[in-house]
């Protein structure tokens, strides 16, 4: 018979037959049939059942061994997925073997039938591939579980990070406590800048508006309140009377008769803390300024002492209203005038000091003049003024001594610099002398050139 290729369905049956032949050598003693010559359909039309081993051992069995081997299932029970994978692999290998047979036997025009060895090799390869797939499947599942665990851990990590990030935001009161102080300091600086702009007349329109409004208010009160004597106690009494009348009117209009409906005004700790935070920068500024004024330095003492003395001597004439009026007018006039005429005033003061020193140096009877001045002051003044005069003289002496010490220290530093760097100081002097000499020579040449034509004429 001509050799023809077997379909894939028969290949699987031949494999199962070979497997049974290996396992049942004791039962099967008949001759091994040739698989290449006989071809039978995989389906049994007669519907004969599977025979028993006893009937197989008998030689006169109606069913041939070929049919039994083809119809017998495989002894190994495999899963459906494994069988489907095996059939797919076998179909793919059958296509590959068909292509190989076509390439080899294409010249003769015949299809070569595969040998049993090729079936065995393909079967071993398919089983090896299925085993590797089965071995790799749990690994894939593990990796998937790891990925899922990693994703869960990432989500948990993110939630923990969000919790950690949200906790300090909720439990960090330090920035909130620092914010009111910064706001108050910013408000104070803004108020200070606005006041300095008004006093120094940087914005002329705004300064003139405020100055005119203040002048009208103070002048109107001076003319209208001639017989009015101001006192703090009377002012508080008038304010209390006004508040009492307003509260009575509000009570009658709203008809609040019952005590239960009345509102109780109480201050809480938050209110006190809020007020303290608002007042803290102002109090710190006042304390710092007072500490600067009363620091005890000679220069600052000489500046503050005259104002304190005037307040002590003429304090009974100064009232709150007059103080506000004088402060208003002086604040709008003195700073601007001093900034404009500061250089001229300093020159005049220096000239007066120079003249006094020259007159004192020219005077021949210095001791007599000094003694007469001291005795006249001592006899014409009171004990209080004597004490104040002695205090001021001591402050002046200390101020003078401090200035002398500073001048001596500056001179010593200059001498040390001259000793340490004599060459560096000489070199710029030499450089400065050389251009001066060149300039002088050029000036002399120009003068000579200008004078020469005059002599000719």
Swiss-Prot record:
Record-level GO cellular component terms: endoplasmic reticulum membrane
Highest taxon of source: Eukaryota
Statement: the UniProt record of this protein carries the keyword S-adenosyl-L-methionine: no
Region annotation (Disordered) ranges: 94-183, 407-457
Keyword Transmembrane helix applies: yes
Reticulon domain mapped to chain residues: 195-385
Compositionally biased region (Basic and acidic residues): 124-136, 413-439
Keywords from the UniProt entry: Endoplasmic reticulum, Membrane, Transmembrane, Transmembrane helix
Chief location of this protein within or outside the cell: endoplasmic reticulum
Transmembrane parts of this sequence: 208-228, 230-250, 314-334, 377-397
Record-linked InterPro entries: Reticulon (IPR003388), RTNLB17/18/21 (IPR044647)
Listed Basic residues bias regions: 149-163
This protein's name: Reticulon-like protein B18
Species name: Arabidopsis thaliana
């Amino acid at each position: 018979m001509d050799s023809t290729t077997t379909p894939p369905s028969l290949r699987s049956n031949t494999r199962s037959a070979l497997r049974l032949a290996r396992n049942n050598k004791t039962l099967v003693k008949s001759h091994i049939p040739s698989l290449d010559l006989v071809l039978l359909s995989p389906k049994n039309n007669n519907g004969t059942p599977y025979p028993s081993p006893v009937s197989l051992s008998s030689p006169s069995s109606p069913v041939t061994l070929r049919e039994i081997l083809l119809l017998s299932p495989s002894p190994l029970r495999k899963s459906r997925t494994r069988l489907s994978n095996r059939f797919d692999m076998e179909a793919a290998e059958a296509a590959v073997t068909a292509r190989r047979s076509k390439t080899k036997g294409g010249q003769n025009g015949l299809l070569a039938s595969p040998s049993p060895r090729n079936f065995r090799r393909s079967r071993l390869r398919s089983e090896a591939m299925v085993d590797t797939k089965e071995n790799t499947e749990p690994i894939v599942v593990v990796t998937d579980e790891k990925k899922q665990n990693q994703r869960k851990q990432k989500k948990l990590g993110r939630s923990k990070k969000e919790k950690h990030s949200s906790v300090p935001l909720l439990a960090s009161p330090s920035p909130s406590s620092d914010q009111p102080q910064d706001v108050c300091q910013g408000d104070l600086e803004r108020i200070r800048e606005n006041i300095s702009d008004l006093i120094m007349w940087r914005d002329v329109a705004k300064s003139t508006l405020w100055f005119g409004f203040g002048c009208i208010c103070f002048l109107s009160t001076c003319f209208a309140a001639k017989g009015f004597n101001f006192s703090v106690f009377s002012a508080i009494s008038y304010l209390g009377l006004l508040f009492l009348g307003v509260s009575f009117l509000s009570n009658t209009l709203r008809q609040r008769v019952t005590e239960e409906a009345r509102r109780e005004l109480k201050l809480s700790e938050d209110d006190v803390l809020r007020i303290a935070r608002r007042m803290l920068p102002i109090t710190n500024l006042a304390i710092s300024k007072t500490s600067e004024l009363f620091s005890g330095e000679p220069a600052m003492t000489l500046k503050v002492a005259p104002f304190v003395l005037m307040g002590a001597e003429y304090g009974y004439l100064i009232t709150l209203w007059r103080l506000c009026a004088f402060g208003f007018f002086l604040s709008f006039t003195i700073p601007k005038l001093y900034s404009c005429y500061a250089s001229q005033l300093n020159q005049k003061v220096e000239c007066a000091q120079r003249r006094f020193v020259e007159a004192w140096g020219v005077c021949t009877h210095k001791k007599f003049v000094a003694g007469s001045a001291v005795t006249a002051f001592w006899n014409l003044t009171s004990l209080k003024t004597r004490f104040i005069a002695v205090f001021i003289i001591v402050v002046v002496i200390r101020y003078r001594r401090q200035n002398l010490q500073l001048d001596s220290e500056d001179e010593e530093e200059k001498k040390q610099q001259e000793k340490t760097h004599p060459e560096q100081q000489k070199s710029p002097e030499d450089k400065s002398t050389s251009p001066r000499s060149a300039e002088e020579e050029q000036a002399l040449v120009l003068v000579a050139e200008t004078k020469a034509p005059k002599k000719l004429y």
